[in-house]
Amino acid sequence: MYLSAQAIEALEGVRKVHLLDAKAVRINKSLGDAVGMTQLGIHQISVPPGHFSTEFHCHRYEEEAIYVLSGSGVATIGDCKQPIGPGDFIGCPINGVAHEMYNDGDEPLVCLVVGQRLAQDVSDYPRLGKRLYRNSGEWSLVDHADIEHVAR
């Protein structure tokens, strides 16, 4: 399927606020949904100035990739803070380090974000000491301290 630049511009963006961080706000245009894709999430996101893209997190099963289209910001990748701008790329492999982006500019930070759409995933939020289990549409959030690791 094909989407023209004009069709993408005309798509209505959905404002999303992260469930764990009210400062993590983005406008999401799901390009993949618009053409019927089900296995990959492909989104154009716009992060307003002074906001984060998401809560600092990492995925245990889904890979994620980010390509900066316009604007500027700072990506936190593990312990590193990296200035980002148009043409920069961030790859987030499974079991990688936690990551987030912050828009420190005065215009929207616009990125193309691509990620898998598995039925199950586990995301860790290390700053909050939380883990999110996602299983076929059901989401369960737990404190890291409450996770009992069982030896096999």
Spans of features found by a protein language model:
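Short acidic-glycine-tyrosine-enriched beta hairpin
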Residues: 79-96
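Ligand-binding loop in jelly-roll beta-barrel domains
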Residues: 36, 94-121
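Conserved short histidine dyad/triad with adjacent acidic residue
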Residues: 25-30, 43-59, 94-95
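Short, conserved beta-strand element in jelly-roll/cupin
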Residues: 44-48, 58-76, 114-118
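A short, N-terminal "cap"/entry segment at the start of jelly-roll beta-barrel domains
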Residues: 1-39, 124-152
